[in-house]
Amino acid sequence: MQSLNYEDQVLWTRWKEWKDPKAGDDLMRRYMPLVTYHVGRISVGLPKSVHKDDLMSLGMLGLYDALEKFDPSRDLKFDTYASFRIRGAIIDGLRKEDWLPRTSREKTKKVEAAIEKLEQRYLRNVSPAEIAEELGMTVQDVVSTMNEGFFANLLSIDEKLHDQDDGENIQVMIRDDKNVPPEEKIMKDELIAQLAEKIHELSEKEQLVVSLFYKEELTLTEIGQVLNLSTSRISQIHSKALFKLKNLLEKVIQ
């Protein structure tokens, strides 16, 4: 495990060697901000029916699982290991719950069908306004539906990946890039190139929001402050960008 201060070393020793409950509680409190962070990012665009308190509970289960299974002797930061466990626990919990109502699923299918129809008609990407006009919906309703539908697709993709893994996915995901097989590196580089090409098809503002959110790790509110736009407007831009990228993500795991 990478260098720790003396206090943390004592906590980890008491927890791993003696299973001291107080040390476990102290470590849970110490790393709780990780749970808050991942809940904040995953909850972006989720339906209002999904409560953050429920996500926090799932994330805390993931954090405890990480404390139970982490090996401090490895040259690995606990934050890195715990992040995968926390995110995985939240995604698994969402996938097991029918968090997207049937009416929302039907609406998502209608929007996706309209997009396919309009893109065939105009031979280009279509805007939420054009989709709204086609379906007799408001633009905001279309954007919200796109957002919910995209997250449902992500859960589906995550489930396919989960079904294909060998139980060691976390170890694989956090291994040293130097040990990646050449053929896997080629595939990874090709995927990055495809994503980069697709991202370049986004509008300048969409590219900026995606970069600030995923690379710089700003919140939607912080991005709004940078661009002098409301949080709801940034959320709309973010939703549109992700919707445009989802087809590529789906093709990658087929």
From Swiss-Prot:
Gene Ontology MF terms in the entry: DNA binding; DNA-directed RNA polymerase activity; sigma factor activity
A biological process from GO: bacterial-type flagellum-dependent swarming motility
Top-level division of the source organism's lineage: Bacteria
Motif (Polymerase core binding) on chain: 54-67
NCBIfam families registered for this protein in UniProt: FliA_WhiG, PRK06986.1, PRK07670.1, sigma70-ECF
Physiological role: Sigma factors are initiation factors that promote the attachment of RNA polymerase (RNAP) to specific initiation sites and are then released. This alternative sigma factor is required for the transcription of the flagellin and motility genes as well as for wild-type chemotaxis. Associates with the RNAP core during all growth phases with a peak at the transition to stationary phase.
Name of the protein described by the UniProt record: RNA polymerase sigma-D factor
Organism expressing this protein natively: Bacillus subtilis (strain 168)
Lineage: Bacteria, Bacillati, Bacillota, Bacilli, Bacillales
